[in-house]
Amino acid sequence: FSCTGGTVAENQRVTLTIDRSQITGKAAGQFAVVNEHIQEGTGAANIIVEVDNTPVSYPKGTFVEANGCIAMEAQHYTAKWDVPGGGFALLKPYGRLGTALKVFPATANFENSEERPYLEYTFAAAKDGNYHVQFHMSATTPVTFEPKQYIGYSVNGGAVQVVNTVHEENRPFFGSEQWYAEGFANVKLTEAIILCHAGVNTLRFYAVSPAIILEKIVLWPDGTTLPESYLGPRESYSC
């Protein structure tokens, strides 16, 4: 710890430095913060920092779960597959994070195609089980008056799941509550549940409908909740 004791009047940053050569497996350290101006026994907080130094070997580009989630920016894929009808291209600067991926030509539609462009991401899950996957996309609208704008995804080589990003399929998207909400927040969010295994997994994001622009993907274990924030969690560490 950069500071092991003292009194703070306004604020002070404490830096924790870890020598991983001295740690085998898992370890934890803690320090206490006490408010001296209120009744004894109240106003204290114990801060616990856990470290996992278990030896692992992941392929290059693998995102590692930490702090209860995995966050991957769209540009940091491990594989990209284009087809004769179109392919993903980088947009920069663009969106809330500065970069995004979009299929060109802009009117390319793969709804009825056997081959679709995709981006592949590699991540390491901490445990077996269900995970939430949340796709962060730009706040675009369908290119037709039909209330549909599809994306596709698959996990670990499984079947492609096609999802409509439009929530209400019985009314026009333009002017709907979702249209207004996405415009104000400047993001389109679509979420699903996927089955992962402990260790390395692969996730593919498929282009289906036109005008879909991917900015980020976030995963977290089922049964847990992400802290609320405007941009979502920062991008995770990758090997």
Whereabouts are the PLM-identified features?
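Extracytoplasmic
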Residues: 1-239
